[in-house]
Amino acid sequence: MQDCRTVYNFADVIDHEFMNFIFISPHFPHTYWQFCRRLKQNGVQVLGIADAPYDELTGEQKDSLTEYYRVGSLENYDEVYRAVAYFAFHYGRIDWIESNNEYWLEQDAHLRTDFNVTTGIRNDQISSIKEKSEMKKYYIKGGIPTARQIRAAEGIDALRNFIRKVGYPIIAKPDVGVGASGTFKIEEDSQLEAFFDTVDDYQNYVAEEFITGEICSYDAIINAEGDPLFESMTVWPPSIMDIVNLKLDLSYYVAKEMPESLRELGRRTVKAFGVWNRFVHLEFFRLDSDREGLGQKGDFVALEVNMRPAGGYTPDMINYAQSTDVYKIWADMVAFGESRTQQGAQQYCAFASRRDIYQYAHSHEEVLSRYADQMVMCERMPELFSAAMGQQMYTVRLQSMEEVNDFVEFVHEKRQ
């Protein structure tokens, strides 16, 4: 346990009650200390809990916290519970508990329930945002188009009947989970049989009709009334599963503008799920062809909800695209219930990465030289993210989709 308390200028915080905010894992992902910094600048006492040694925190991470409590493992609920109890004893009532991290959402909800923290999701609501099978009920409730689905636990005969309706291929994926991990594309009967024969926990899977199109996300910060304080759209590659399995190069971008149809569906989804006080990342397909029962080419179809910010450097990319600070907008929502952060000029922010196993037509130095004026980030990716995101990333701010496409082509072009 380490104490890094600082003295506040109370003149900066006279317009809201002094609050105690426990941030779980403020050091990882490694950009998340910025949420803590903005909270602290808004006069909030930021109390960090993680399992990293205090001396391994960066100076920025330390400065963003009022106090830090190290546990042996964040996986040990009893230890984390005792850490929260320690803060409650020393600082008084805990107002918020949050990680903004998919991995810890259930633990966050458990802690809120045990400590009667009412500013976020609790145990009785967690299944609706973690289980894909539960998500479908809320999409239907909100009248939001979404892919048809069946639980694999219903058995192979039930899936055969399902396939007669929707056709091959289908996608089988864990009911609880994110990304491509544990996901199967099933294209014929033999693969369906192999899935049931080889996947020991198939009872914990769902199967969905396969939809093709761009994946577009509605990224928003939602206030206590369930209304957006900020909205943005990111366009993702159609299959992270293929990128991981086939070792493809990755690119994606934050869009300059959001179609009104996505904005309307995003807001309806927020209301259907009863979301409040959160940064959300809601995924939709943009159909690349007409699809009976779902919509026409260009329409949006719900994929899944994520009650946390988009992964990787996407929050920073949103900042560059929208000339704003989403870390600050989120902290404003917590401290003031409104955004006190300006937005400026809008543009595209594009990400493209490379893998060390390939030889590229243009050198690292050529990429830096060509995009010197537009480059906003350039670094090696952490090993944890390299399977999906490659080893070397470049992120630029651009004015048109033509420029985005040219940038991706230049970075990804292979040597002949």
Tell me the role of every PLM-derived stretch.
Residues 87-94, 165-166, 200-202:
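Glycine-rich phosphate-binding loop signature in dinucleotide/nucleotide-binding domains
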